[in-house]
Design a protein with these regions (language model features):
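Mid/C-terminal beta-alpha module of Rossmann-like enzyme folds, strongest
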Residues: 238-305, 335, 340-379
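N-terminal Rossmann NAD(P)H-binding glycine-rich loop of SDR-like oxidoreductase domains
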Residues: 4-25
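Glycine-rich phosphate-binding loop and adjoining beta1-alpha1-beta2 segment
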Residues: 29-52, 60, 66
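Conserved C-terminal active-site "lid" loop/helix of NAD(P)H-dependent oxidoreductases
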Residues: 232, 267, 291-329
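NAD(P)-dependent short-chain dehydrogenase/reductase
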Residues: 140, 172-226, 232-234
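Active-site Tyr-X1-5-Lys
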Residues: 153-182
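NAD(P)H-binding glycine-rich loop region in Rossmannoid oxidoreductase-like domains
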Residues: 49, 53-104
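Conserved Rossmann-fold NAD(P)-dependent oxidoreductase catalytic core, especially the SDR/UDP-sugar
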Residues: 83, 91, 103-158, 182
């Protein structure tokens, strides 16, 4: 039985990851701010497994992660670290973002270093994001990310900048200390392929809300652009596949479909508008002009942060390493487009009724993009 130390375990990706890890022969140590709150989250979903789930109170922003002496001793027996912690908040301030991502990376690396020197860390898995500019070749640069990072990486948005600098820092430290590192770069994450339920509304949800209000009359960038997506259950399965591997050094996995096979932004908005019974935008606006509009007050009207447009991209990404693990047809088989209308409907509802609560007594399932709520029982 291997011991996994997981950050972000109560988050949108983390809860799904715990569900997948539960199928393995593991003991999971979850870093949480509040043990009682975390237990309640998993109890409500019927997924609390006390036999192999252990909640450890701490904080990414604190030295030694704020662990008690007893908890630190337990964590030092870890075989694999999965670092998926940090909020999805593109509007975070520089101070907030640096505290969570940069300081968090520093503190968890100190832990990884101690484990590796004590017993040998089998693997460090870091979940970052597909827009990170760093990979296995260009990350071999000797800069102090805390002192020189902001000047080196000229990205205005603090959330993106600090998250990517944290990626660079962990890569630097893994190389220096010698622990195996897997960096997983998912695109924008939506809900499970089984339900479409997307609790994380800060990403795609902002686009859905803008369209619902009739504030997205144009196609940002045009047909050459796209918004890559992945479901949280398929992402979790991929992370577990990487967890099973013996990782010798440092490997990056970018989970973005080949551009020629992916939906472009015009097609995505068309499906979205049809799902919401809204008129689809027809006119394309060049991305530089679109960003200028957003920076000049358009963000206040559409409620989409100007920096949110950076996730709509015309870039091509290398996904060879991901295909090597999952097979050449993995992206096609797991395409979000198969259930995208259900994701849009879920986000539309959540954005309109933000105080609503999901009753976890009912099991939610999809059938041909129709959502069913079932109550388990005997009849």
């Amino acid at each position: 039985m291997r011991t996994v130390f997981l950050t972000g375990g109560t988050g949108f990706i983390g809860k799904q990851l715990v569900k997948e890890l539960a199928k393995e022969d593991v003991k999971i140590l979850l870093l949480v701010r509040s043990k009682s709150k975390a237990i309640r989250i998993f109890q409500e979903r019927g997924s609390l497994k006390k036999a192999f789930m252990h909640f450890i109170e701490g904080d990414l922003t604190k030295i030694d992660l704020g662990l008690s002496a007893e908890d630190k001793e337990r964590v030092l027996k870890t075989d694999v670290i999965i670092h998926a912690g940090g909020p999805m908040d593109i509007q975070a301030t520089s101070k907030e973002a640096a505290s969570v991502f940069l300081n968090g990376a520093k503190h968890i690396n100190e832990l990884a270093k101690s484990i590796h020197q004590l017993k040998g860390l089998q693997q460090f898995i870091h979940v970052v994001g597909y827009m990170s500019p760093f990979d296995d070749t260009n990350s071999k640069i000797a800069i102090d990310v805390f002192q020189e990072g902001n000047n080196y990486l000229k990205i205005k948005n603090p959330y993106e900048r600090t998250k990517f600098l944290a990626d660079l820092y962990i890569r630097q430290q893994a190389s220096a200390v010698g622990y195996p590192l897997s960096v997983i770069n998912p695109p924008t994450v939506v809900g499970s392929s089984k339900t479409g339920s997307t609790e994380q509304i800060a990403g795609l949800g902002l686009l859905v809300m803008s369209m619902r209000r009739g504030l997205m009359p144009v196609i940002p960038g045009g047909k050459g652009y796209r918004l890559p997506l992945i479901s949280n259950d398929e992402l979790a399965k991929f992370i577990v596949q990487v967890f099973r591997l013996e990782q010798p050094t440092i490997q990056t996995y970018t989970l973005v479909e080949d551009k020629q096979h992916d939906q472009n932004i015009a097609e995505l908005l068309s499906i979205m508008s049809e799902s919401m019974n809204m008129r689809a935008p027809k006119i394309s606006v060049p991305m530089p002009f679109m960003k200028a509009i957003m920076n000049s007050g358009g963000s206040k009207i559409t409620k989409i942060p100007s920096d949110g447009l950076t996730f709509i991209t015309k870039q091509k990404f290398s996904n060879v390493s991901a295909k090597k693990i999952m097979g050449g047809d993995w992206f096609k088989k797991t395409s979000v487009m198969k259930f995208f209308p259900a994701v849009v409907a879920d986000l539309d509802y959540r954005m309109m009724y933000q105080n609503g609560r999901h009753n976890h007594l009912f099991k939610r399932t999809l059938c041909d993009n129709t959502t069913f709520y079932q109550l388990q029982g005997k009849g």
